[in-house]
Regions:
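Glycine-rich FAD pyrophosphate-binding loop
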Residues: 23-43
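Predominantly flavin-linked oxidoreductase catalytic cores and closely associated redox partners
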Residues: 11, 105-227, 244, 260-262
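Active-site-proximal substrate-binding core of FAD-dependent oxidoreductases
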Residues: 282-320
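A conserved beta-strand/loop capping segment in the N-terminal third of enzymes
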Residues: 48, 52-101
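Conserved Rossmann-like nucleotide-cofactor binding loop
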Residues: 14, 37, 142
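C-terminal auxiliary extensions adjacent to catalytic cores
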Residues: 320-371
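Beta1/beta-strand and adjacent pyrophosphate-binding region of the FAD-binding site
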Residues: 1-14
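FAD/FMN-dependent oxidoreductases across multiple families
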Residues: 208-286, 290-291
Length: 371
């Protein structure tokens, strides 16, 4: 006899998403995490497309959604700007702490509990050992609890830093992205929040050794309209490595950032964490871990691989060429709010309208992804 049907290690988005499925299936489960409070520290900007909200049946209650998105701006340091406008919501920005706390309601969670080791069906923690038929590892990008995870290379990690600043809502469009010399391998973002607050953040590839705090400060000096009183900050690592083909090892399932389920082209992790967590939770509820492996390979892995290939092109292209993208996109016309369609369409447009970008895509071995 086992203590639990399933033990979930990690009470972030992926672990909580798996927990919700198990809870609704009436399974005997527990979620273990070393932190003191759900939703803290914040590990996400909270942005996600309408497509994935619908696909994953994510809640959009006003209490947990900071903003709804209908227009997006993409620009560079030279002032080149492309704006995509829609007559319907195409995305949301969650209040991330409230979102995770909403997911956690009613779940069997034990905080202040660090998992030290996992061996077969036994989980060793700082509060003693427990056993489970199945185990879901949702303990983040630097987890040491599975042999699947190698030490991530610096080129496969983005360092994200964000400041929530006192600023009025934008009058031109809802959210903005800058491809900037201040953000090598990444970008700068401006997301709306509640109560005259906006989230100004930056992601830089770790290999660049760029200090994201200093880089965001330098960027702000170039864009003084973004200056505002800082209410709070977040910083976190974002894994953008090649997705693993195998995520199930016997009775152990790997989800979320621990499985590199981040959309590497944008650094967006909320959709991959939710998707992988739900798939693993469903498999665990049916006591069939291999079901998760099959659905990972057929559903999630191909999407993650496409985004990784886009990221690979960006990392092949010199930064000064990346800065040309907003200019090239001036002739791009978005058709849907589905980012599974629009991001590859956008990348194809860039490749077809720039001979040098085509060359870099060929060098990266990624042109087949867009034809």
């Amino acid at each position: 006899m086992f203590d639990y049907d399933t033990v979930i290690v990690g009470a972030g988005t992926a672990g909580l998403s798996a927990g919700r499925i198990l809870h609704e299936s009436g399974k005997n489960y527990i979620i273990l995490d070393s932190k003191e409070r759900i939703g803290v520290p914040i590990r996400s900007t909270g942005g996600i497309s309408e497509y994935f909200v619908q696909k994953l049946k994510m809640p959009v209650n006003d209490e947990i959604v900071s903003a709804r998105i209908r227009s997006v701006g993409i620009q560079n340091d030279d002032g080149d700007l492309t704006v995509m406008r829609y007559n319907h919501d195409v995305g949301y920005v969650y209040d991330f702490t409230k979102y995770e706390q909403y997911l956690a309601k009613g779940l069997n969670i034990e905080l202040n509990t660090r998992v030290l080791k996992i061996a077969h069906n036994e989980i060793g923690t700082t509060k003693g050992n427990v056993t489970a038929r199945n185990i879901i590892i949702a303990s983040g990008p630097t987890t040491s609890l599975t042999s699947m995870k190698k030490k991530p290379q610096d080129i496969d990690m983005i360092v994200g830093y964000e400041e929530t600043r006192r600023l009025p809502p934008r009058a031109d469009f809802d959210i903005s992205f800058w491809l900037s010399r201040h953000a090598p391998g990444g970008y700068v973002w401006d997301f709306p929040d509640r109560n005259n607050l906006r989230r100004i953040g930056i992601g830089v590839v770790k290999q660049s050794r760029e200090n994201p705090v200093s880089a965001l400060g330098d960027f702000t000096r170039d864009h003084p309209e973004l200056t505002g009183e800082v209410h709070h900050t977040i910083s976190h690592l974002i894994p953008v490595a090649h997705p693993p083909s195998k995520v199930v090892f016997g009775n152990i399932m790997i989800v979320g950032d621990a499985a590199n389920s981040v959309f590497a082209s944008t650094g967006g992790g909320l959709q991959g964490a939710t998707w992988s967590g739900q798939l693993a939770g469903k498999a665990a509820s049916m006591e069939n871990p291999e079901m998760y492996q099959r659905e990972w390979r057929s559903e999630l892995y191909p999407v993650l691989l496409d985004h990784y290939r886009i990221k690979k092109i960006f990392y092949t292209v010199p930064n000064k060429k990346v800065l040309d993208i907003p200019r090239i996109l001036k002739t791009f016309r978005a058709k849907t709010g589905n980012d599974l369609i629009e991001i590859p369409r956008l990348m194809k447009h860039v490749i077809l309208h720039s001979p040098s970008m085509m060359l870099y895509a060929i060098q990266a071995g990624c042109t087949r992804s867009f034809y």
